[in-house]
Amino acid sequence: MNMAIIANGKIEKHARLRSIWANADARIAADGGAVNARQHLELAPHVLIGDLDSLDEATRRWCEQAQTEFLQHPRAKDQTDLELAIDLAIARGAKNISILGTLGGRFDQMLANVLLLIKPARANIPARIAGSDFDAWIATHSATITGNIGDTVSLIPLSERVEGIVTVNLKYPLHNETLYLGSARGVSNALTTIHAEVSFGRGLLMIVHLLESTEHS
């Protein structure tokens, strides 16, 4: 099942984001993410989860009219609203997860949001943070990157080391090499064809793909 999650971060009205949200088999809003859905994506979530402290009355009524399922948690909790949403997606059988609205606002929350991608990656569930002009995801062994020639691709280790990296169709190739946590060596590579491949033997590797300019609508 293809699931989309919307968080309470910065988001904009954009055809790409609306398409991801509309085409998901299940749509989950993490608390104030429902406000983002109402204001920018114009389609209600199937499920709203969190402590709901960021939910305004207009959005609450909008979700109720759409028969959204409400899963309210206490404000004093060990997980963020986005983590609750990711856990719910995994528990309900997600095969693919797209997460919107994770950036902007407090730096600590933004960083934590990005690192939450580790959880579905370890469960072998493909998950990405999707923006209007980028995708970011974590690979555990291999990845295919599809885009336009010249698109920027960055490879960022999230484990102490990522070993045995081999790339195909990137401008600066890696041949059975190691990237280390804290090194920026893998930043700002580029596609040389519309498809590139990355494989490695061990570690967690974040891949960030900056998309060619896309139109608002």
Predicted regions and their residues:
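N-terminal beta-strand-loop-alpha-helix module at the start
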Residues: 1-62
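Short Gly/Thr/Asp-enriched flexible loops that form oxyanion-binding sites at enzyme active sites
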Residues: 107-118
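Short phosphate-binding loop-to-helix
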Residues: 70-91
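General beta-strand structural signal in soluble alpha/beta enzymes
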Residues: 6, 28-31, 50, 71-72, ...
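Short, well-ordered alpha-helix to beta-strand connector turns
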Residues: 24-25, 45, 66-67, 94, ...
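Short, acidic/small-residue loops that bind anionic groups at enzyme active sites
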Residues: 119-135
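Long, charged alpha-helical interface segments
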Residues: 132, 139-217
